Amino acid sequence: KKKNIDFIVYYRVHKNKKSLFPYKFIHNLIAAKFKIIIICDKLKHKKVINYGNISNYNLTKLQAKAKYTIASAENIYSLFTLECITHNMKIIIDKKNKSKIRFYKSSFLKINFENTKELNKIKLI
């Protein structure tokens, strides 16, 4: 199957997680013209597609068409991330969190979220 979705991002508004979500990195991806789908809570940006809360069946269909997701800093092995790995998606993680990678190492792509030049690493895959 052709993977025609660049990113699926699991976004949850939570007061304790707000500082962990890579808003700036998402904006840099949008500026670089990546196609981004947001699931769960809505991210207010006109260039992303918000799906909201969807069934696991529909999520699985989207994951089969997607290339990447972004690992959450507080839990890089969330159920969502593990499902993405089973659908052969690459997991983008901020380089400063690379020490958290213990399993499925080949599924992770380490990027400095502060350096926009590193977006080229994604485009080359």
Model-derived segments and spans:
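Conserved active-site histidine-acidic residue motif and adjacent donor-binding/catalytic loop
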Residues: 42, 48-63, 76-77
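Short hydrophobic beta-strand element within catalytic cores of glycosyltransferases
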Residues: 90-96
